[in-house]
Amino acid sequence: MMKDMKTVIDLFERSCEKFPDNPYLWEKKNGKFAATSYMEVKREVLNFAGALCQLGMDREDRIALLSEGCNAWVYSELGMLYAGGVNVPLSIKLTDNEIVFRVEHSQARFLIVSANFLNRVRGIEGRIGGVEKIIVIHSDINEGKYVSFELLQREGEIWRGEHKELLNDRIRAVTEDDLVNISYTSGTTAE
């Protein structure tokens, strides 16, 4: 059974088939924890993959992700993988200089940030010139480089409906040899 599963996408798809209505994620909303099923997560993941394709993301593009743990973090990471992108996760504990180094060194084209850390990103924006779009989770921002994650989700859903085969081709092109993550450890920067 495991021999057929060669990518993270394969593993996730298998879980969606086996447990479609089971809770996959829990997130606190309005003071109470609410479950999101595997199939609901998959829909959000595909919407984000579609949004990335609509933005012009190419296979193997790097996408930095600076956020506390939340459902959108999972949608983002899996959506990147479905679209053939490479996740560059950034700890919220990093200094501004460490964020700049990782974003620049990884050559990230896109940066996903939660609204809680938006001011930090605004403070370093001039130092991360390779980033073309900054996607903000839990925000309604839509100005210049900045765009709301939630808005992209809606646009991604529309794009997906109009370009189903393009997205399916993108997903089928993902192989077990693809780079999916660039993780910087404490010794990575040689500082």
Model-derived regions: residue spans:
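AMP-binding/adenylate-forming domain of the ANL superfamily
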Residues: 2-24, 43-44, 62
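Short, conserved catalytic or interaction motifs in soluble domains
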Residues: 68, 92, 187-190
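Conserved AMP-binding/adenylate-forming core of the ANL superfamily
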Residues: 24-74, 78, 95-100, 148-154
